[in-house]
């Protein structure tokens, strides 16, 4: 294939697309480049469908190669291993706007791989990867209702920035990614510094406008190469079988969906029983029945048709009657309860229950050495706040092996982390490293937002001086033609059978995080705006209920949390405190039982569960790094005697000076040992500090009041 290139300019920055040179055996391959960031994206489709499944088998991988940033991996084998968290999040960012655009019923395996080949710190690669994934999919001829593209929107002062640099993202008030097609918005994800809803809506609109040029460029790119997608027609269901399912099940399903008093388990059990009875009825059909001609094939279609019937009836009930399966109105939140200190010894914990969704969050406070060092494309990257999310099988009543953290758990933890970070205190105010673990104990929708609420409770319980409490809510959507219903606080069945899962978190004053995924091919800005505005009332209601348990951070930390003391020492004295081979700092730790962490700028953090031990270590370090002043009087200890020369006296930890034999007393001294012995406490004055930093001391000319002052220090 001959190389083909095309470029598009988005808000003054050129983005280039090229194909035909790299990865020629992949179904579709495109190199996306902007500045000096280059991402190779490939899309490959299996030649045959994967039979026996009822989902689309799409796999998206995002590969960070550290050579892209001129680095060698820090692992023992010096090779990239399991994808880091940022790579997993980038893969999910690519997946979410693409997945709804593949046709229903399409079950060929598709794999999209985005490999970062070069990294320019002015151009984050994830946005380029989304553009490349869409283009590569179309180049491969895979059935796909694209193109789709994305852009990042930042906010500096009052100005929005399209595709900001890493520095602008870090210093700005907003990090928002919006993806869309020409039909509408497909995905939104954002972290914000408590911005008003109106600013978020304006940012989405601004970003969606910037996406249009990339959509046009892709269309021209594919048209110029004369790529035609593979013809695909979704297999049609036998209308006789559809009628059979609707006739036999609709009335019973509708009755269950209107039984508002049923719990989730009771409703699920009744629906399962109806589905089982449907199968029994089908199996009992006579041989002469036309549905029996392809009995095995038709029987395998029953579960999907039953789900379709349930979905249709639930959606109709919401659209026509405005009633949900639990009897709530469209904007009503489920019953809420909150509690803190539900388990002993931990540094802080919060239990948040909303309906049958329940999350326990636990806070652990640590020191600087507990910060997470990230071995990824970003050098010297570390985190002082970590949020980990666990979703065991028992939370949904299932048997599931516990085999590590999946992509979903990483994504939910990152979203909760993003929601909390803007309200954390500055490091100088609260120098702890903070880890929060959210344990999902029961799941019936919106566990990620439950994690945000439980974590806010836990942080306040731990005594972390957060700026404002944060709450979160998940919004849903039912859309049939022009009929639209927005749901507040969706539960599992509404998420499963609905069109949107839109999570919004924030304080009383504004939004800190949001994430929108849809199952349809785009929604308008007007629908999105309505969902954001409706979410505010839900968030504030939830926040009010949360604050019943605890309304502000505790003044005292848990007795089991470490006590931190900080001090600043001159950078040139770091080596003195550490000592040769770490000898000095080890001695301080052994003597006091405290932990000592020293940063490159001279910040020293001393920690211990026993505050007295931390104070003792701090005083030792202060003494070691205190500057000795000329003409000042000190109480010191004799450390060495040099016959006929004098005595060395330690006036501060690690700082010794010489008292010459002529300076030992007002009278003539013939022998040093006649005046002093090793271990004696003695009051001395600093006579001078020579050019080499050597301290000369004297015992002569010291006023009695100075002696008393020195002994009293």
Curated annotation (Swiss-Prot):
Which lineage ranks, top first, belong to the organism behind this chain? Bacteria, Bacillati, Cyanobacteriota, Cyanophyceae, Gloeobacterales
> Which SUPFAM superfamilies does this UniProt record tie to the protein?
Eukaryotic type KH-domain (KH-domain type I), Nucleic acid-binding proteins, Ribonuclease PH domain 2-like, Ribosomal protein S5 domain 2-like
Domain (KH) ranges: 562-621
Protein name as annotated: Polyribonucleotide nucleotidyltransferase
One biological process term from GO is:
RNA processing
Q: Which reaction does it catalyse?
A: RNA(n+1) + phosphate = RNA(n) + a ribonucleoside 5'-diphosphate
The cross-references to Gene3D superfamilies, in alphabetical order and at most eight, read: GHMP Kinase, N-terminal domain, K Homology domain, type 1, Nucleic acid-binding proteins
PROSITE patterns xref list: KH_TYPE_1, S1
In the record, what terms sit under GO molecular function?
3'-5'-RNA exonuclease activity; magnesium ion binding; polyribonucleotide nucleotidyltransferase activity; RNA binding
Q: Which UniProt keywords are listed?
A: Cytoplasm, Magnesium, Metal-binding, Nucleotidyltransferase, RNA-binding, Transferase
